[in-house]
């Protein structure tokens, strides 16, 4: 699974290796882009699936918890899938097919455009 990060998040993930996206080899259903925005006084992490723009919002990540970024993303995606009706075995299969989490640069303009659109609503 690839988790694309914007420059805003790259600054918070100080010691993490950030790779180029592997668009040729990774199915886009297993790619997510993330961006941190300020809505009101709150930091909101927006997580969008690259293939279908399915969007998840996560609020108020404590500064000390950014070192657990990939664990949070994994858990949030799993919980969102449960909320929309996927069974536990289907979620487990999705994560098996997705493989290990790789932090990459974001996957392009379309997903980031969707994220920016959400922040303007």
Where are these regions (language model features)?
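A short, polar/charged loop-to-alpha-helix boundary motif
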Residues: 63-79
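A short, conserved beta-strand element enriched in hydrophobic/aromatic residues
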Residues: 31-68
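Globin-like tetrapyrrole-binding proteins
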Residues: 1-22, 85-121
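Solvent-exposed amphipathic alpha-helical surface segments
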Residues: 80-84
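Short, basic/aromatic recognition patches
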Residues: 13-39
């Amino acid at each position: 699974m690839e988790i694309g990060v914007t420059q805003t998040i790259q600054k918070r993930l100080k010691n993490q290796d950030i790779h180029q996206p592997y668009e040729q080899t990774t199915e886009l259903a297993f790619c997510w882009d993330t961006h941190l925005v300020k809505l009101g006084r709150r930091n909101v992490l927006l997580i969008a699936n690259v293939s279908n723009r399915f969007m998840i919002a996560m609020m108020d990540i404590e500064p000390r918890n950014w070192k657990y970024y990939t664990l949070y993303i994994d858990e949030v995606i799993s919980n969102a899938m449960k909320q929309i009706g996927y069974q536990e075995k289907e979620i487990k299969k999705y994560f098996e097919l997705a493989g290990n989490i790789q932090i990459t640069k974001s996957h392009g303009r379309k997903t980031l455009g969707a994220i920016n659109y959400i922040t303007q609503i």
